[in-house]
Amino acid sequence: MTETFDCADPEQRSRGIVSAVGAIKAGQLVVMPTDTVYGIGADAFDSSAVAALLSAKGRGRDMPVGVLVGSWHTIEGLVYSMPDGARELIRAFWPGALSLVVVQAPSLQWDLGDAHGTVMLRMPLHPVAIELLREVGPMAVSSANISGHPPPVDAEQARSQLGDHVAVYLDAGPSEQQAGSTIVDLTGATPRVLRPGPVSTERIAEVLGVDAASLFG
């Protein structure tokens, strides 16, 4: 049975977080608000739940799922090593609308899709998302839409696409940014912007001390 909670109401928010935590621990899917767009999430270490997430979206393994974290320190156990520039970008833009692609720790027992030893990480700037992430740990999260359809910027848009595939919808009103996060790849010799977004290339270049044009090389 699908449940929806209005997180503008403190009591519903509290009950919603409890319900979402239970759903995630049971291997089910949850729709959650973030600062960019609404996301559909699962326990990052539950491969069956991640497979269900991809199925709900109609998405193949060739488009692996990113991971949201609830604190800066969480990523220390998820990456092989902190690449050059990662700490600077995290200090400048986390929590916020910047996703970083890094080489994952080889010991991790998860299956996020065909990620070829990499993982995309982000710490969202949203109190409901952070509260949930701090309760359950890292979550595999993708935009809460059917593949090829517009990413939802509110819970109703997400529910209209995903319906009963999701156990719990946490409704916190419209997303602030209403656009997907900026994605920066830190797995190569130099940083590259894979997807422009709310965090501008110019701001990223300034933090890294490089020319903005080099980020598209």
Swiss-Prot record:
Keywords: ATP-binding, Cytoplasm, Nucleotide-binding, Nucleotidyltransferase, Transferase, tRNA processing
GO molecular function, one term: tRNA binding
Pfam families for this protein: Sua5_yciO_yrdC
NAD recorded as keyword: no
EC number(s) recorded for this UniProt protein: 2.7.7.87
Domain of life (superkingdom): Bacteria
Catalysed reaction, written as an equation: L-threonine + hydrogencarbonate + ATP = L-threonylcarbamoyladenylate + diphosphate + H2O
GO annotation, biological process: regulation of translational fidelity; tRNA processing
Catalytic class of the enzyme: transferase
Keyword DNA repair: no
Residue ranges of every copy of the YrdC-like domain listed in the record: 14-199
One Gene Ontology cellular component annotation held by this UniProt entry: cytoplasm
Compartments reported by the entry: Cytoplasm
PROSITE patterns in alphabetical order: YRDC
Family: Belongs to the SUA5 family.
Function field: Required for the formation of a threonylcarbamoyl group on adenosine at position 37 (t(6)A37) in tRNAs that read codons beginning with adenine. Catalyzes the conversion of L-threonine, HCO(3)(-)/CO(2) and ATP to give threonylcarbamoyl-AMP (TC-AMP) as the acyladenylate intermediate, with the release of diphosphate.
Entries under NCBIfam families matching the protein: L-threonylcarbamoyladenylate synthase
Protein name listed in UniProt: Putative threonylcarbamoyl-AMP synthase
Lineage: Bacteria, Bacillati, Actinomycetota, Actinomycetes, Mycobacteriales
